[in-house]
C-alpha cells in the first residue's frame, strides 16, 4: 500500500544548514552514525515515558533496541529502532523544518571558517540531517506507537531543495532510516568499521545497539546471519565512576548535548540518604549560539529510577547556570511527574539547591586547579554567571568569588583578576575595592578619573561589560570591603589621602572660590554642582555623579532596553593645576570666559558619555577659540 504522495520544499533554513553542514563537517563525517543512534535512543526514551501511563503502546514488544545493517550490493546502510515512531505530520514537521527560534540569525553568523563553522553547527544540533554528509539520498520509514500499521509514513529526500512524504503500511512500530551512500563513502559498508564507530561513540547508551553479522562455517562459507549486541547497553551514569574512562564521559556529553567539542570539566555523583539521586554535570567549553535567548530551552535531562522523563528540565538549575549540561536520575520523584508538578515540589527545591551548590563548587575547583581552562570558561560564560548575584542571594558571595575582571594591575584587556586577588594587593589603609565602568576596556583604561589612582599606584578594576552596572547594583561589597566607583563626586580615599597635599588643596579652594561662583552662575541648573577637584593630573575637567544618583553607564543600559531614563545631573569638577583652567579663571571678558567654560564642560561630557547633545555647537566653539 502506498498513496497520497506529496512533494514539499524544505524550509529555507534547512536548505542552508544542509549545504553548510555537508561542507564544514565532512572531515568528521563518521559522526552521522552517532547522531542517528542518539536519535534512536531518544525515541526509545520517549516511548518508555509514554508507556508509563499507556503500556499498550509497547504493542507486546517492550524489548527496545537500535539495529544497524548494511547491503553492499545496494550501497545502503540502515539504522532502525522500535521507539516512539512518527506520524506523517510529525515527519513533515521534524524532518522538513527547524523549529528553533533565532535560526536565521544563527545561519547568518556562519562564515567561511570551516573549523569555526563545524563547532557552531555542532552546537546547533544537526541530528538527522547529518545523514546527508555521506548519503545522496535518505529514506525514512516510520510508524508512531499506538496507530494502525497502514498509518505508516515514508519520507524521502536527496538533501537538496525538496522532500516527499507518502502513506505506507509498516507493521513494526518505530523508525527505519536508510542511507543510500555516495560512491566515495563505501567505507561505511564494512562491519568492522561500523563496530569501531559504535564502540567509539555509542558504548555509553543504555539501549542495546545490534548489528546484523554474518557467521561462517569451517570452510569459510556463509552459514547464517544474526543480530549481535555490540555496546555495553548500560546507562553510563549507573556504572561505577572507576569503570568509566574520560573518553566515555566525553562521548556521553556529546550524546546528550549534541555538542561537537569536549566539555571543560564534569562531575559524576551518587547521593544516598534523605535524598537518593545520581547527577552527572558538565561544563561546556563553548557557549551555544542562543545562550542569551531567554525563550530557548535549557536544563538537565531528567530520569526517575532510570526511566527517561523529559529533556530540558530547567527547574533544577537557576537561570544564571543555564549553560550547565548533564542529567539527573532521582529515586524520590514520582514516575508520573510533569513540569507543573516539578514547579511546586519540596523534592525539586532540595535537588535544585544541591545541584546549584555542586555546580558552583565545580567552577571554584576549576578556577583553583586549572586556570587556563577557567579562563576559557570565563570568556564563554562570564556574562551569564554575572546574572547570579541578582538572582541568587544565598550564594552571592560564592558566585562573586568566580568573577574575573580587567584591572590596571595587569595592563591587559583580559579579564583575569578576581576580587580576592584585588583584596590581597590592597594598599595599607585602603578600605574599598575601586572600579570604573565604561563602554569599552579602552575607554575605561583611558578615563581621566584614573589619573589620581595611577599616580598613587592604587589598583582599579576596569569594567566594560554591558551587564556590569546592573551587577554592581546587587554586588555592593565583597569579603567585608565595599565596592566603590571612582567616578563618584563624593569619592573619599580616607587614609590613602596625602595630608600635605590636603593643606595645599584647601588653600586653592579658598583662592579660587570666586572663580567657582562665576562658573556656577554661568551654568545654573544645567549641572548639580561645580567644584575644584584634586584627583586629576593631565585633564582639565571631569563630570561625576553622586553616590545616590544613577551612573552614566546605568542610564545607557536603561536607554538600550527601551526604558525611560531619569535625567542625570552631573557635578562639574575643575582641575586648578591645569593651564586651561588657570587661563579661564584669569579671564575678565565674560564672553570669552563663557566660551572656555562651555568648552571645558563639553570636553568633560564627551569624555564621560561618549556623545554630546549638540556636537555642531561644540565644533563651532573649538574652531572659534582655535582661530583666536
UniProtKB/Swiss-Prot annotation:
CDD domains linked: HATPase_Hsp90-like (cd16927)
Keywords: ATP-binding, Chaperone, Cytoplasm, Nucleotide-binding, Stress response
Highest taxon of source: Bacteria
Ranges for region A: 1-339
Cross-referenced PROSITE patterns: HSP90
C: region residues: 557-628
Cellular localisation: Cytoplasm
Database matches in InterPro entries: HATPase_C_sf (IPR036890), Heat_shock_protein_90_CS (IPR019805), HSP90_C (IPR037196), Hsp90_fam (IPR001404), Hsp90_N (IPR020575), Ribosomal_Su5_D2-typ_SF (IPR020568)
B: annotated segments: 340-556
GO cellular component, one term: cytoplasm
GO molecular function per UniProt: ATP binding; ATP hydrolysis activity; ATP-dependent protein folding chaperone; unfolded protein binding
Annotated HAMAP family: HSP90
Function summary: Molecular chaperone. Has ATPase activity.
Protein family according to the UniProt entry: Belongs to the heat shock protein 90 family.
Subunit architecture: Homodimer.
Protein known as: Chaperone protein HtpG
Gene transcribed to yield this protein: htpG
Amino acid at each position: 500500500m502506498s498513496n497520497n504522495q506529496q512533494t514539499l520544499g524544505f524550509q529555507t533554513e534547512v536548505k542552508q544548514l544542509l549545504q553548510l553542514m555537508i561542507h564544514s563537517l565532512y572531515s568528521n563525517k563518521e559522526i552521522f552514525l552517532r547522531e542517528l543512534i542518539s536519535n534512536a535512543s531518544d525515541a526509545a526514551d520517549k516511548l518508555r515515558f509514554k508507556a508509563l501511563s499507556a503500556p499498550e503502546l509497547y504493542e507486546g514488544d517492550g524489548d527496545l533496541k537500535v539495529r544497524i545493517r548494511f547491503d553492499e550490493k545496494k550501497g545502503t546502510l540502515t539504522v532502525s529502532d522500535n521507539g516512539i515512531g512518527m506520524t506523517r505530520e510529525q515527519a513533515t514537521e521534524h524532518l522538513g523544518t527547524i523549529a528553533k527560534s533565532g535560526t536565521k540569525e544563527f545561519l547568518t553568523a556562519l562564515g567561511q571558517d570551516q573549523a569555526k563553522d563545524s563547532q557552531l553547527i555542532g552546537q546547533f544540533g544537526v541530528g538527522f540531517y547529518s545523514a546527508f554528509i555521506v548519503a545522496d539520498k535518505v529514506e525514512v520509514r516510520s510508524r508512531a506507537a499506538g496507530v494502525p500499521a497502514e498509518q505508516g509514513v515514508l519520507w524521502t529526500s536527496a538533501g537538496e531543495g525538496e522532500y516527499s512524504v507518502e502513506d505506507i503500511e509498516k507493521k513494526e512500530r518505530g523508525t527505519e532510516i536508510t542511507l543510500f551512500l555516495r560512491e566515495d563513502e563505501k567505507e561505511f559498508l564494512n562491519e568492522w568499521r561500523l563496530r569501531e564507530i559504535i564502540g567509539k561513540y555509542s558504548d555509553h547508551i543504555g539501549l542495546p545497539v545490534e548489528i546484523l553479522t554474518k557467521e561462517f562455517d569451517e570452510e569459510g562459507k556463509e552459514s547464517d546471519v544474526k543480530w549481535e549486541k555490540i555496546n555495553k547497553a548500560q546507562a553510563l551514569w549507573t556504572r561505577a565512576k572507576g569503570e568509566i574512562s574520560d573518553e566515555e564521559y566525553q562521548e556521553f556529553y556529546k550524546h546528550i548535548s549534541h555538542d561537537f567539542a569536549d566539555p571543560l570539566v564534569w562531575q559524576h555523583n551518587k547521593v544516598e540518604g534523605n535524598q537518593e539521586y545520581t547527577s552527572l554535570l558538565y561544563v561546556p567549553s563553548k557557549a551555544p549560539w542562543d545562550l542569551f535567548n531567554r525563550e530557548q530551552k535549557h536544563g538537565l535531562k531528567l530520569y526517575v529510577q532510570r526511566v527517561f522523563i523529559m529533556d530540558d528540565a530547567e527547574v533544577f538549575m537557576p537561570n544564571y547556570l543555564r549553560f550547565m549540561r548533564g542529567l539527573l536520575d532521582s529515586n524520590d520523584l514520582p514516575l508520573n511527574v510533569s513540569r507543573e508538578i516539578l514547579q511546586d515540589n519540596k523534592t525539586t527545591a532540595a535537588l535544585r539547591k544541591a545541584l546549584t551548590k555542586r555546580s558552583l563548587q565545580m567552577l571554584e575547583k576549576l578556577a583553583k586547579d586549572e586556570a587556563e581552562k577557567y579562563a576559557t570558561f570565563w570568556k564563554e560564560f562570564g556574562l551569564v554567571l554575572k546574572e547570579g548575584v541578582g538572582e541568587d542571594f544565598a550564594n552571592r558571595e560564592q558566585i562573586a568569588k568566580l568573577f574575573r575582571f580587567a584591572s590596571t594591575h595587569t595592563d591587559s584587556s583580559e579579564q583575569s583578576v578576581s576580587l580576592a586577588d584585588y583584596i590581597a594587593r590592597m594598599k595599607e589603609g585602603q578600605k574599598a575595592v575601586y572600579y570604573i565602568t565604561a563602554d569599552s576596556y579602552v575607554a575605561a583604561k583611558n578615563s581621566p578619573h584614573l589619573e589620581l589612582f595611577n599616580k598613587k599606584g592604587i589598583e582599579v578594576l576596569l569594567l566594560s561589560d554591558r551587564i556590569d552596572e546592573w551587577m554592581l547594583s546587587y554586588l555592593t561589597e565583597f569579603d567585608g570591603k565595599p565596592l566603590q566607583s571612582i567616578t563618584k563626586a563624593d569619592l573619599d580615599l580616607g587614609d590613602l589621602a596625602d595630608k600635605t597635599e590636603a593643606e595645599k588643596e584647601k588653600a586653592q579652594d579658598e583662592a579660587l572660590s570666586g572663580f567657582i561662583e562665576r562658573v556656577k552662575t554661568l551654568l545654573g541648573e544645567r549641572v548639580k554642582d561645580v567644584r575644584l577637584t584634586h584627583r586629576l593630573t593631565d585633564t582639565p575637567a571631569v563630570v561625576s555623579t553622586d553616590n545616590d544618583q544613577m551612573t552614566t553607564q546605568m542610564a545607557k543600559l536603561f536607554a538600550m532596553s527601551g526604558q525611560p531614563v531619569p535625567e542625570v545631573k552631573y557635578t562639574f569638577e575643575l582641575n586648578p593645576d591645569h593651564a586651561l583652567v588657570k587661563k579661564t579663571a584669569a579671564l575678565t571678558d565674560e564672553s570669552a570666559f563663557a566660551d572656555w567654560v562651555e568648552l571645558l564642560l563639553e570636553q568633560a561630557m564627551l569624555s564621560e558619555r561618549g556623545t554630546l547633545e549638540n556636537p555642531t555647537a561644540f565644533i563651532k566653539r573649538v574652531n572659534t577659540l582655535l582661530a583666536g
